[in-house]
């Protein structure tokens, strides 16, 4: 547990620790505890924490400091005690992208296969979609459960998906808001501590990380994605957890749909044994690793077979219904997608040339979706769950002139022309198809 301020050396001052990091010196666990506990309690003001964060952004943190920061943030709040629930507890975290919807597929697959999946998720911001926003497109679905109710849901069906509560890693919530306001978000050590402090607070035994790379990812280069993955895997392992990271492609959207209710429909298709091949492949691979790390199978290969069985037998689909029902949602949406929000209008983005799709700027797809009301620029912005993009052409596909590239599903046409222009510019079309097959899963680290 985090030590109280009175047990820390009285000579510590925030200004000294700011100077120390400014000068590239390593901070001890006690010094990091002092900063985090002091800032969380309000004893250290915003301006001093902002100065320290900028020093970290410039000078960086070593692996020991990252582990200490993660543990201090983790222990700033309540640790979810799931020891009373039988079975291993395993979760998945994705760094986010466009059409990134695997949580809604793998949670019921893995829960149906005998593990407990306590998933504390986030909302979309900027060009990336959020799991909570997708779930809230299901009428009545409640993502704001008290922790005791969350435990009950997990006990009943083995899966639960909620938002971060005030009790879970409060230091992270406060520090992230300050990072966002001071341009100190893009730092691997700070990103790792933010993600891992929330995930480890769930009381899990193992964690599977889906670290995206490419034009639609937070980390654009594979090198940066691998560095982040390595740090998160090591941090989790230092704390006694089994952790694996998959580096996966986000140079184009995952699946054929982006937008909240549209993505729910696509998830149901996969749980019904259909759906896009890439979405199905990644969902099964992530589920397989969860089964393996959770000791439900002796190998990842067995895990894939188990995941397939949960889909083919209908057990995963029924588990999804049960999870929706227990969180107050209308489970009928699983069999009748007309009960989900629908956009009033649609418009096609047409190709201006013929050839092959050689690349896409995937981030721009997410930006266009947000522009139409399907995303947020600020956390307090409202969201239109019916807005969506339906992708007809992927990298490597042949395209004729005047052929639809994307269908936009929208309610307000105020920014339609701007969104159409941005989407059209996001496609690169050349005379020849790109050579070689694009791997969906680039690398696997840890495990």
Language model feature labels by segment:
Residues 58, 104-118, 198-203, 238-239, ...:
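Alpha-helix C-terminal capping segments
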Residues 155-204:
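Phosphate/diphosphate-binding glycine-rich loops and adjacent basic-rich segments that engage nucleotide
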Residues 11-12, 21-84:
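N-terminal glycine-rich anion-binding loops that anchor highly charged ligand groups
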Residues 134-160, 230-236, 240:
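A glycine-rich helix N-cap at a beta->alpha junction
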Residues 120, 154, 162-165, 195, ...:
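Short beta-strand segments
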Residues 16, 21, 26-29, 39, ...:
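Well-ordered secondary-structure scaffolds
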């Amino acid at each position: 547990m985090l030590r109280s301020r009175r047990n820390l050396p009285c000579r510590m001052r925030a200004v000294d620790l700011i100077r120390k990091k400014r000068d590239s010196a390593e901070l001890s666990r006690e010094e990091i505890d002092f900063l985090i506990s002091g800032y969380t309690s309000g004893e250290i003001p915003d301006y001093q924490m902002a100065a320290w964060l900028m020093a970290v952004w410039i000078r960086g943190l070593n692996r020991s400091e990252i582990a200490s920061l993660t543990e201090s943030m983790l222990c700033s709040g309540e640790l979810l005690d799931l020891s009373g629930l039988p079975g291993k507890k395993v979760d998945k975290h994705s760094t986010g992208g466009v059409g990134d919807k695997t949580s809604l597929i793998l949670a019921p697959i893995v829960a149906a296969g005998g593990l407990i999946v306590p998933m504390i998720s986030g909302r979309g911001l900027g060009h990336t979609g959020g799991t909570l926003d997708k779930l809230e497109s299901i009428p009545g679905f409640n993502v704001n459960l008290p922790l005791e109710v969350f435990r009950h849901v997990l006990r009943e069906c083995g899966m639960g998906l909620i938002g971060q509560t005030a009790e879970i890693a409060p230091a992270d919530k406060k520090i992230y808001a300050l990072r966002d306001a001071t341009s100190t978000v893009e730092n691997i050590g700070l990103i790792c501590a933010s993600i891992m402090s929330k995930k480890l607070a769930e009381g899990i035994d193992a964690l599977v990380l889906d670290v995206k790379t490419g034009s639609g990812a937070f980390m654009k280069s594979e090198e940066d994605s691998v560095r982040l993955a390595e740090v998160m895997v090591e941090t989790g392992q230092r704390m006694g957890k089994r952790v694996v990271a998959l580096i996966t492609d986000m140079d184009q959207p995952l699946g054929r749909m982006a937008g909240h209710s549209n993505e729910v429909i696509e998830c149901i298709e996969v749980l019904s044994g259909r759906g896009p091949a890439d979405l199905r492949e990644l969902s099964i691979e992530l589920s397989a690793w969860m089964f393996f790390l959770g000791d439900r199978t002796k190998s990842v290969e067995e895990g894939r077979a188990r995941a397939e069985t949960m889909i083919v037998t209908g057990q995963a689909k029924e588990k999804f219904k049960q999870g929706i029902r227990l969180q107050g949602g209308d489970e009928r949406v699983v069999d009748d997608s007309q009960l989900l929000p629908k956009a009033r209008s649609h418009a096609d983005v047409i190709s201006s040339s013929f050839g092959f799709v050689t690349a896409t700027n995937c981030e721009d797809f997410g930006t266009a979706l947000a522009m139409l009301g399907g995303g947020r620029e600020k956390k307090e912005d409202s969201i239109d769950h019916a807005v969506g993009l339906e992708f007809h052409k992927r990298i490597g596909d042949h395209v004729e002139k005047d052929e639809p590239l994307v269908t936009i599903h929208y309610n307000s046409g105020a920014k339609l022309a701007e969104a159409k222009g941005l989407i059209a510019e996001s496609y690169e079309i050349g005379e020849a198809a790109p050579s070689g097959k694009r791997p969906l899963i680039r690398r696997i680290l840890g495990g």
